[in-house]
């Protein structure tokens, strides 16, 4: 496992002790997400907060986690991650390529055969109805796989 020491070193440099490993579900992850939103302090924080609210409305049973130094939402498997960059906030759906997207929300990571993502830019409105449908489709896909 040559990569294991490198990951541990990188985690020490970029994250606090509480974030070193994947934080299990519950309040700790929720607090880290709150902290990320506050740290961003601009339109990206507002967008991430809105997206978080839409995810929770679409699936009140979604579990908030903190993995890979980003917010993660799951329900019987990964639903999506919420990443923030200088110019975008990105929701990456782990199994997005297998989801129907009739509203054509996916606009990033389109070339792969597993993930799909939605890039949100400053001032952009969220199509909440379509996003909720996509989140619910991801949950349905996860729960149907979990039952097998």
Segments the model singles out, each with a brief description of its role:
Residues 1-148:
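Charge-dense, helix-prone N-terminal extensions
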């Amino acid at each position: 496992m040559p990569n294991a020491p490198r990951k541990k070193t990188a985690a020490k440099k970029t994250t606090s002790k509480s974030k070193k490993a994947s934080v299990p579900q519950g309040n700790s992850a929720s607090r880290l997400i709150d902290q990320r939103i506050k740290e961003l302090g601009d339109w990206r924080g507002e967008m991430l907060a809105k997206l978080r609210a839409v995810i929770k409305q679409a699936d009140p049973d979604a579990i908030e986690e903190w993995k890979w130094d980003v917010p993660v939402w799951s329900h019987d498997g990964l639903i999506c991650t919420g990443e923030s960059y200088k110019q975008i906030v990105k929701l990456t759906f782990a199994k997005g390529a297998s989801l129907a997207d009739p509203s054509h929300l996916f606009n990033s990571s389109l070339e792969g055969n597993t993930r799909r993502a939605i890039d949100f830019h400053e001032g952009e409105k969220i199509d909440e109805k379509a996003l909720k449908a996509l989140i619910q489709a991801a949950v349905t896909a996860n729960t149907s796989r979990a039952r097998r």
